[in-house]
Each structure stands twice: as C-alpha cells, then as structure tokens.
Regions:
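Iron-sulfur cluster-binding electron-transfer modules in prokaryotic oxidoreductases
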Residues: 1-204
Length: 204
C-alpha cells in the first residue's frame, strides 16, 4: 500500500504479459482493477464485465430469476464512482434478473466507502468496521447487493447480508450470504491466476 515503485514494477509486468499474449482488450469484474488499468495503462482497452453482459445477454436461466426475492439495497463501489456506463449497466442487469432493489441516498458518484477502501481494515481495523456498520445501517433492507467482492464482504461485517451481483446471475443455489474469503484464500487465488497467465504465455 503506497509503494509506487513496486506497483510500477508489477504493472509493467502485467503489460508485458498482455503484450506477449497478444491481448488488446481486458475484461474485468473488479472495480479496482478496472480503474487501475484505465488510469495507468490508458493504451489498453478495458471493459467492465457488467457492460459486456448487457451487450451479449444473460443466460436465459438467469432472467427474472429473482422477481420473488426480497428487496435489496444497491451499493456502488468507490473506484468506479464516476463510471456512469457501469452504473447504468449494473442497474440494467438487476432489472433483467428481476431483482427488486432500492438505491442508497448516497449512490453512484456520491457513494460512500464500504470500509475496505485503501486497505483500511489492515491499518485501522476499528475505523474500518465503524464505517462498515455506518454504511450498512443506511438502508432498512436486510440484504445489500454490490458488484465488488470487498464491498459485499464489508456489508456482511457491517451487520447485513452482503451479496455479489455475479452470484445472483450465475449461481442458482446461492444462499444470499456472501462468504468471507480470508487473506490466505485471496492470496492463493492471485497466485493461481498468476500461474494460469504463465501457462498462457508458454503456449504463445
């Protein structure tokens, strides 16, 4: 966190990997990744998975799946607060799956931090959890849907049921409760992704 020199090294490696694979477009479901690539590698075309799903269409099995689900509140992640197309496309997807939802008073470009921003939970856990509870308490809905893994987990820690939009779309057996991933699990996921990229490079 804050180590720009190490960030530049990592980001340069990412660009080399993409170049080696001949990738001209990156699709991401992570709002932090979206803004990082858009900001520091503007020559790379970055596409939000949520916008892509609107373009190509949802699986038929997902359409209207949640028309009888209890209303949820929609939390917009901080990193893409100014990305109006993503805001629009996420709401389009919610309408397509039939989910009843309400907006937070402070949403879209005025959204509030979920409590995980800037790795606050690692540096000031008490303040992070206070913000998680504050944000979660700003709706009477028991469940809060977001399109960011960290945000969904934060809403759980804040006392509500945090739900990720992709689970609502692709996981028909989802139990309406975001499972928390520990630091080790998240690290392993990143390591596995790194291994897959290396394998792709070896085959090009």
């Amino acid at each position: 966190m804050g180590d720009m020199e190490q960030f530049k090294i990592y980001h340069s490696q990412l660009e080399r990997d993409l170049d080696t694979m001949g990738a001209t477009t990156v699709v991401t479901a992570c709002e932090n990744c979206f803004m990082s690539i858009k900001t520091y590698a503007p020559h790379i075309k970055i596409v939000s998975l949520y916008s892509l799903l609107v373009e190509i269409g949802l699986p038929e099995s997902a359409k209207e799946r949640h028309k009888n689900t209890l209303k949820m509140a929609l939390h917009d992640p901080c990193p893409t607060r100014y990305e109006k197309k993503i805001h629009h496309d996420v709401r389009t997807l919610l309408a397509q799956i039939g989910l009843p939802y309400e907006e937070f008073k402070q949403n879209r470009e005025k959204t509030l931090c979920c409590g995980s921003g800037g790795m606050l939970e690692l540096t000031n856990s008490a303040l992070a959890h206070e913000q998680m509870r504050t944000r979660a308490s700003q709706t009477e809905c028991e469940s809060i849907v977001s399109y960011c893994q960290s945000c969904a987990e934060s809403m759980n820690k804040g006392g509500k049921n945090g739900v990720h939009l992709l689970d609502l779309i692709f996981n028909p057996t989802f139990e309406m409760k975001q499972k928390e991933q520990g630091t080790l699990k998240k690290w392993y996921n990143r390591f596995s992704a790194r291994q897959m990229i290396s394998a792709l490079k070896d085959n090009t």
